């Protein structure tokens, strides 16, 4: 691969973009017409690289990896069901709180999720729609599980934000939006539940614009709402989609100027529709693909997921203009999807998805290259290579072995605890994907075991569940009790139920003598040792063995920081381990 004209290594050539390779080859042949004759292997190798990149790029362009975010009860799970229905992943859409023979929401597979009708863990579902491969990440809506949601958003290239038409933008929606903004994740807005009485659509558009500091581009518009709902109007196609309660929405193909539209709308309704759509298009921004993908503009769709109105238009938008897989930041460089070597990162580990097998699945977002079943990948946390022999694609609990996968795909890797959240897997490259955080817990509780004979089993259970990254586990330097750290109290309930259901161990939680925790480190090793030795009663280790300062109050954190200026106290810790 090397000669005097282009003295680069093979790896460096492979990292070049398609345009750069084409320019290199064109200029090389132009400057030296005899290049192909003198260096046939070099020219052939460049041509092979171009062919490989073309194959990868063709698959990348077909993929949309997106998350759905919302406040609890905004209708996210119902929307998820309807998207899956349209993608052929399921054949019957059911309500979350099902009765009789109606099915539970397919993405809510954990027992407590089924009982409460909320998502507390991120489900990954893959389906095809109009030739586009959709990788849908159904994130937890409950605020106690925001950390899991944050990590899931690191794997998404775009997001659908679901807003309740009656309630507008709620607290959790705003928090999740800020996470998307930090990562420059473009957002499509779906204003849901227009079959109920809600806020004025202009007020909702203004709220999105004001609270999120985004330009808004209306793509569909409601024709009435609540009992007066007659459908939606597709502003991009100038078509009226009719709705009647109890019937499937019908795309009439009629514009507001068509005489036949009066079969569906009264004169007053038609006049209102004309006035509102004209005002909406005049007052709001036109859709701009570049602004949307830059995170500066959100296209807005109206509908009701429960009645299946507006869902087709939303999914068409995802397929048409949501971004394909993007370059991902790493410790070495931004990794382009069309790089030949395979790379990916683990944003989630789920234990015991199958009660019969006590399994542990690592969810890996592929970032570059063509993945093939059976290939060996280097694990950043250990530096060792592991064979990926049984990679799987997901639909809730349903699994399917996959022979190949491409950038943007989410594959599951069964393992016995060797792969952890934040791990990078590469085709023998020394790099680490960045931006997968661990947050300091807001609630700390001691674990009380009813049966002391099961202490070893409890340790295994806690370590296994901690690998999922939602619940954190700390071992104090003094005392025998484990301490768990969570964001909200619902997590404690989930933890206790899962330990009992999956490990047959009954536990209870009691108040720990700590209020908060901070990871500590220092550039001065001697100073760090003095701090650790002088604060043994307040020190613990997390599951990675990192030292953690357990404080009785936020005031104590501040006081200790002033007392030990050379020690760093961190509320957020990067989960990616140091490369071996």
Q: Which stretches of residues belong to each language-model region?
A:
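Structural and coupling elements of P-loop NTPases
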Residues: 49-580
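Generic L/I/V-rich hydrophobic alpha-helical segments across diverse proteins
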Residues: 21, 39, 46-47
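Short amphipathic alpha-helical heptad-repeat segments
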Residues: 13-25
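Short, charge/polar-rich alpha-helical segments
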Residues: 6-13
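Charged, low-complexity interaction regions
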Residues: 29-38
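Intrinsically disordered, low-complexity linker/tail regions enriched in Pro/Ser/Thr
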Residues: 1-2
